[in-house]
Amino acid sequence: MTTLKDLFAGLLLVIFFPICSWAEGVKLQPVEVEAPFPMDSVFLCIFPQRDFLITKYGAKAGGKKLNTKAIAKAITACHLVGGGRVVIPKGEWLTGPIHLKSNINLYMEEGAVLRFTDTPSDYLPAVMTSWEGMECYNYSPLIYASDCENIAITGKGVLAPKMDTWRIWFARPQAHMEALRKLYTMASTDVPVEERQMAVGENNLRPHLIHLNRCRNVLLDGFKIRESPFWTIHLYMCKGGIVRGLDVKANGHNNDGIDLEMSRNFLIENCKFDQGDDAVVIKSGRNRDAWRLGTPCENIVVRNCQVMEGHTLLGIGS
């Protein structure tokens, strides 16, 4: 016979279990940054000790099997329990776009290579992003997050996209330039962003390698980048984070190292940049879109970085 006491105990268990689960989520460790201006602490994400190996979700190394779905399954599983590490083991892993979720640390073991495809259709459907300071819907960045918090890419692995198609797109033929003019016109006349569909026809607007859109508490730590279709790391309207110990080499057209656009409270340190364009850029949008969004960059410290090659060491508004 079920008593009232038994029912009450069961109710407590139902209430208490999810509280315990979420209590084991991401912790935020404040990091004081010495700066010549008042600056809030940035926060270092400390992720729970839960690992989700992509191999357990069907991923196979070797550079032949497309692992996009397996990686997405691992990210979703990790997200649903409150976060942890999605682990990319040693080996070469062929993939399309990787979309992060809140409380995810994409961790690459030493010897791990994420080899992104260069087939444009793999990066559809289009996502909300920006192109040279103007918001639009374009091909998904190779690694993308939108409106997430507590996200990281860490480890000693390498991000190394295939580049054959993107190199052809470097040429910026007439159709591409006409598409850009159309985007400028749409942005300057306040056409709604969802109507600025650019991943069509021969527009050839290349995707970013990493684009984090309106995210909070970001950590990029320790990995290497070898080549990029467009801007390499784009922190867009993000709040708070640490970028450290990166080794970035991308010598193609528009290959900025890191662009902080309309972002605040960031520490960039101990990174190495070898770029085909600017190394570090701080900017706040372009023309009408910039006024519409009205979000300045502020509280950014860049220190102890090496620039081997680049159009500028530090560009402001470039």
Task: Identify the residue ranges that each predicted region occupies.
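Bacterial N-terminal signal peptides that target proteins for export
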Residues: M1-L11
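Extracellular/periplasmic carbohydrate-active domains that bind, remodel
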Residues: F16-S318
